Swiss-Prot record:
InterPro entries in alphabetical order: ACAD9/ACADV-like_C, Acyl-CoA_DH_CS, Acyl-CoA_Oxase/DH_mid-dom, Acyl-CoA_Oxase/DH_mid-dom_sf, AcylCo_DH-like_C, AcylCo_DH/oxidase_C, AcylCoA_DH/ox_N, AcylCoA_DH/ox_N_sf
Residues annotated with N6-acetyllysine modification: 45, 525
Entry protein name: Complex I assembly factor ACAD9, mitochondrial
Pfam short name (any one): ACAD9-ACADV_C
Residues bearing the modification N6-succinyllysine: 96, 242, 525
Enzyme class: oxidoreductase
EC number, UniProt record: 1.3.8.-
Gene Ontology biological process terms in this record: carboxylic acid catabolic process; long-chain fatty acid metabolic process; medium-chain fatty acid metabolic process; mitochondrial respiratory chain complex I assembly
A Gene Ontology molecular function term of the record: long-chain fatty acyl-CoA dehydrogenase activity
Lineage of the species this protein comes from: Eukaryota, Metazoa, Chordata, Craniata, Vertebrata
Membrane-protein topology: Peripheral membrane protein
Length: 625
């Protein structure tokens, strides 16, 4: 189990599962929509312009007391089921989830969490999905299996499927009778999704697409009955020319010509089914095109963008359990006649873990609150930031926990080494963090570029008025102008106890906006090639979003008198101070010719290494002659 000693099984666990299932069904039958404030869903993009869009962010999104009590009624039984019934150590050792465990997950409705109720699912909001993710995260293999099924496997049908497709496929997918998989990655195309080679050719009678190709590292690949498959198709453009474009398909295993390899032997998430899937002359009815022919790339990106936010709540759930277990050890383990918990370097690690959990949790639920607004708001940047922050924090925090535990953390008798192995994949799947950083930065810069186009053109052409205005702004900034973006003061939305942190956020946002304009002026369209610059832009933005999330959440906690809100204030202020100074350093590195910027040295070192494909320094014991 994920950090838990196995308790009694059999009747007790079955009863827990039955209670959780009953409460969940009753809850979904009588619940009402989430009540959150409306928002313009442009928060992250507005940061690139030096603005803080308060609408939908302040105050922190919340659910009603009635909804909260109903959620908590089934959270308890569900947590009890995962604690008593799921043997994570066995799943890890045997490399598979037992059939009876999968069946109980189906009976709990966990295969249809976000499938609309009219198709047999629970129809839960993004916020409630995030809340469930905290509990499900007690076992990483189950988390990945369920996420691959519904966050990406069937998500395309919900997002862009027509009514016939939804009615045909969603009921059996939501019940778990059928399991879904998402087939995009290929041997020669990982992060470069557009370079896939799998091809779908229209049959002569134009009734089928003939699908041929192979996909790799497909979660649920050996279990799935239904696949969302992406393939190249020939598309005739308006001018009559033919081009290859990606198309998405709903593919049934029963269509034939589908085989899969044996499950991969993985470092972590070992209980999830990961394998190659091969398609050989698989006949897919034209009715099973998902979206439009040639529109598959957009479908794939929308699917991936829609689910990333939930990693924040899932990792936070795992970290909370890890903190609990590690704290018990630190408070009872004695060294030098003192408990480990009394030593400053150990205390620092607990503060770090708590801070990271608080920030990612705040970011995740702020994003889910945005996503729950009507009209499918675009929160793709926010969701990507949650994924990057939470995945890297997970790896860092589990490593720190093992350091506290010493040798015990390295032993397979305990769950900690498994947690470390399970955490590593988080930085890779659902978009590598490197690719997501580029996505975060470029999407925001593209937005800013559209807004600032005329101004940048005037600066490049030497328009006197615009140039003088820019010089004046830089002069005022250099003199230490006071930045007021409306977070503090009599009409401020941040609680006074967080005022200094709010001022730091405002200052960072202001100078970030100025820096964005400078970067667009300096690099223009060529900025897409400046990956080290884009990485810093993304890192700053992630910090700004984290600062915003904790300030909004902590202010709400103070306002409504939540227990331990003073602890939240400590965590929020700690993070904001650290993020503020990190941002200042990153902003200074983005200055042209800044001494802090080592990009050219980095490129030169890597170029020399890669030319030789080796470490090229002489051995320290070598002599010149």
């Amino acid at each position: 189990m994920s950090g838990c000693v196995l308790l009694s099984r059999g009747a007790t666990a079955a009863a827990a599962a039955a209670r959780a299932s009953r409460v969940l069904r009753e809850f979904t039958a009588r619940r009402r929509p989430l009540h959150t404030s409306l928002q313009s869903c442009s928060f992250a993009k507005e940061l690139f312009l030096g603005n803080i869009e308060q609408k939908g962010v302040f105050p922190f999104p919340e659910v009603s007391q009635h909804e909260l009590s109903e959620i908590n009624q089934f959270v308890g039984p569900l947590e009890k089921f995962f604690t008593e019934e799921v043997d994570s150590r066995k799943i890890d050792q045997e490399g598979k989830i037992p059939v009876d465990t999968l069946e109980k997950l189906k009976s709990l409705g966990l295969f249809g969490i976000q499938v609309p109720e009219e198709y047999g699912g629970l129809g839960l909001s993004n916020t409630m999905y995030a809340r469930l993710g905290e509990i499900i995260s007690l076992d990483a293999s189950i988390t990945v299996t369920l996420a691959a099924h519904q966050a990406i496997g069937l998500k395309g049908i919900i997002l862009v499927g027509n009514e016939e497709q939804k009615a045909k496929y969603l009921p059996k997918l939501s019940s778990g009778e059928h399991i879904a998989a998402f087939c995009l990655t290929e041997p020669a195309s990982g992060s470069d999704a557009a370079s896939i080679q799998t091809r779908a050719t229209l049959s002569e009678d134009k009734k089928y697409f003939i699908l041929n190709g192979s996909k790799v590292w497909i979660t649920n690949g050996g279990l799935a009955n239904i696949f969302t498959v992406f393939a190249k198709t020939e598309v005739v453009d308006s001018d009559g020319s033919k081009t290859d474009k990606m198309t998405a398909f709903i593919v049934e295993r029963d269509f034939g010509g589908i085989t899969n390899g044996k499950p991969e032997d993985k470092l972590g998430i070992r209980g999830s089914n990961t394998c190659e899937v091969h398609f050989e002359n698989t006949r897919v009815p034209v009715e099973n095109v998902l979206g439009e022919v040639g529109g598959g790339f957009k479908v794939a990106m929308n699917i991936l963008n829609s689910g990333r936010f939930s990693m924040g709540s899932a990792v936070a759930g795992m970290l909370k359990k890890l903190i609990e277990l590690t704290a018990e050890y630190a408070c009872t383990r004695k060294q030098f006649n003192r408990n480990l918990s009394e030593f400053g370097l150990i205390q620092e690690k607990f503060a770090l873990m708590a801070q990271k959990a608080y920030v990612m949790e705040s970011m995740a639920y702020l994003t889910s609150g945005m996503l729950d607004q009507p009209g499918f708001p675009d929160c793709s940047i926010e969701a990507a930031m949650v994924k990057v922050f939470s995945s890297e924090a997970a790896w860092q925090c589990v490593s720190e926990a093992l350091q506290i535990l010493g040798g015990s953390g390295y032993m397979k008798d305990y769950p900690y080494e498994r947690m470390l192995r399970d955490a590593r994949i988080l930085l890779i799947f659902e978009g590598t963090n490197e690719i997501l950083r580029l996505f975060i930065a470029l999407t925001g810069l593209q937005h800013a570029g559209r807004i600032l186009t005329s101004r940048i053109k005037e600066l490049k052409s030497g328009n006197v008025t615009t140039v003088m205005e820019t010089i004046g702004r830089k002069l005022r900034d250099s003199l230490g102008r006071t930045v007021d973006l409306g977070l503090t003061g009599d009409l401020g939305v941040v609680h006074p106890s967080l005022g200094d942190s709010a001022n730091k956020l405002e200052e960072n946002v202001h100078y970030f906006g100025r820096t964005v304009e400078t970067l667009l002026l300096r690099f223009g369209k060529n900025i897409v090639e400046e990956q080290l610059v884009l990485k810093r832009v993304a890192n700053i933005l992630i910090n700004l979003y984290g600062m915003t999330a904790v300030l909004s959440r902590a202010s709400r906690s103070i306002r409504i008198g939540l227990r331990n809100h003073d602890h939240e204030v400590l965590l929020a202020n700690m993070f904001c101070v650290e993020a503020y100074f990190q941002n200042l350093f990153s902003l200074s590195q983005l200055d042209k010719n800044a001494p802090e910027n080592l990009d050219e040295q980095i490129k030169k070192v890597s170029r020399q290494i890669l030319e030789k494909r080796a470490y090229i320094c002489a051995h320290p014991l070598d002599r010149a002659s």
